[in-house]
């Protein structure tokens, strides 16, 4: 398939050919969901903690004598049913990360790219370069292209001026090709690829 290439000013800059093996798949929501869940689980902190009955600071002495009170038989005041007692099966510090096969992760990226193509949400820009690091000028260029919520993927090296100018614009993310991922593609409205990014993707999945 072919897509028109544009400049940041909105002018035509030729066409680019896209591989059907990367951009032409029928998107599978189950694959996308698995990859996104894996990504978010990897990011989750896991610093949650609640003290159990062995950890709370409280006497371990028997609350009252076993017999003769008419009350229920209790031992430690650290038991979870009492106020100030330990939490039963509470959260512990742990990693939420889980394994996902490399082939599934790669397939997820191809399905995410295909989903954006199918929704007509992919724009190819010849070069992500800004003459100066001015947010106002870049925001105006994005407005011309109709980009209010977008992920920009550049080549292996991002232009410093472009990156600085874009980082203060709301709902705009800029990543080098090494950082392309399913979650960021799906969470943004438009996917903007530089020609260098398209070439790198073709090389990666060849």
UniProtKB/Swiss-Prot annotation:
Compositionally skewed regions (Basic residues) per UniProt: 64-77
RNA-binding in keyword set: yes
Entry keyword annotation includes Ribonucleoprotein: yes
MF annotations from Gene Ontology: rRNA binding; structural constituent of ribosome
Region (Disordered), start-end ranges: 63-97
InterPro entries: Ribosomal_uL4 (IPR002136), Ribosomal_uL4-like (IPR013005), Ribosomal_uL4_dom_sf (IPR023574)
Protein origin, superkingdom: Bacteria
BP GO terms, sorted: translation
Alphabetic keyword roster: Ribonucleoprotein, Ribosomal protein, RNA-binding, rRNA-binding
UniProt-listed HAMAP family: Ribosomal_uL4_B
NCBIfam families: rplD_bact
Protein family: Belongs to the universal ribosomal protein uL4 family.
Function of the molecule: One of the primary rRNA binding proteins, this protein initially binds near the 5'-end of the 23S rRNA. It is important during the early stages of 50S assembly. It makes multiple contacts with different domains of the 23S rRNA in the assembled 50S subunit and ribosome.
Subunit structure: Part of the 50S ribosomal subunit.
Descriptive protein name: Large ribosomal subunit protein uL4
Organism: Rhizobium etli (strain ATCC 51251 / DSM 11541 / JCM 21823 / NBRC 15573 / CFN 42)
């Amino acid at each position: 398939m072919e897509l028109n290439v544009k400049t940041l000013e909105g002018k035509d800059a030729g066409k680019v050919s896209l591989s059907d093996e990367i951009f032409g798949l029928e998107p599978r929501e189950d694959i996308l969901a698995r990859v996104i869940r894996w990504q978010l689980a990897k990011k989750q902190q896991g610093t949650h903690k609640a003290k159990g009955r062995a950890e709370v600071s409280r006497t371990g002495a028997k609350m009252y004598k076993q017999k003769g009170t008419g009350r229920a038989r209790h031992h430690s005041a650290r038991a979870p049913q009492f106020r100030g007692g330990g939490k039963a099966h509470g959260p512990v510090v742990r990693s939420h990360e889980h394994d996902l096969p490399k082939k599934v992760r790669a397939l997820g990226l191809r399905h995410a790219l295909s989903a954006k193509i199918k929704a007509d949400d992919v724009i190819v820009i010849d070069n992500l370069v800004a003459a100066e690091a001015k947010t106002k000028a870049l925001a105006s260029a994005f407005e011309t292209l109709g980009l209010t919520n977008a992920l920009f993927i550049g080549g292996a090296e991002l232009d410093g001026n472009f990156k600085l100018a874009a980082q203060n614009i709301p709902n705009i993310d800029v990543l080098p090709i090494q950082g392309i991922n399913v979650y960021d593609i799906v969470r943004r409205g438009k996917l903007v690829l530089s020609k260098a990014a398209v070439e790198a993707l073709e090389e990666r999945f060849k």
